[in-house]
């Protein structure tokens, strides 16, 4: 079989499966519990958190694990909105975002008073940077754009979006 949807779901690398097997069969304990296999689970999570933090130049306590991309997207948008709503209520995203982003933006509009601007894309799915830049207001607290579209393969100009956010808004928060 030839599999052409790696942008959406990729087969797990064999070395990852091998590294994870003990936690599916031997050390499957709840890391918040006090029994021995729980301690092994907690050790692995702590070590993984430290390794990821080191790669990202972050502190281990700044690393959170979620069940997947949709949960992460929901959390990023809702948490950012709640944390910065005293500075503004405007979010910018694109019309072609993943439903996890679009539905969360709709929720924030209807339930939390957010103002969301959905900027367009060109025929290749690339965000219209002029439209994005024009959408920035003093109330803008977040720009959320997917780095690469899993359906059409478009790679967005993330560095340019970050530059625009910092230059015009001074908040500089972007969710990619």
Indicate residue ranges for each PLM-predicted region.
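Pyridoxal 5′-phosphate
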Residues: 1-173
């Amino acid at each position: 079989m030839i599999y052409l949807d790696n942008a959406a779901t990729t087969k797990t690398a064999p070395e990852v499966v091998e590294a994870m097997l003990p936690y599916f069969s031997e050390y499957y304990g709840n890391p918040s519990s006090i029994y021995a296999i729980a301690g092994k689970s907690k050790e692995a999570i702590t070590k993984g958190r430290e390794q990821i933090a080191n790669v990202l130049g972050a502190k281990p306590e700044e690393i959170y694990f979620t069940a997947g991309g949709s949960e992460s997207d929901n959390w990023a948008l809702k948490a950012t909105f709640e944390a910065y709503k005293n500075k503004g209520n405007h979010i910018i995203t694109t019309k072609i975002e993943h439903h996890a982003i679009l539905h969360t933006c709709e929720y924030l509009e209807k339930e939390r008073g957010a103002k969301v601007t959905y900027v367009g894309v060109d025929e290749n799915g690339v965000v219209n940077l002029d439209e994005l830049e024009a959408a920035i207001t003093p109330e803008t607290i977040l720009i959320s754009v997917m780095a690469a579209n899993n359906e059409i393969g478009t790679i967005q100009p993330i560095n340019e979006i970050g530059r625009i956010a910092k230059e015009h808004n001074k908040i500089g928060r972007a969710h990619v």
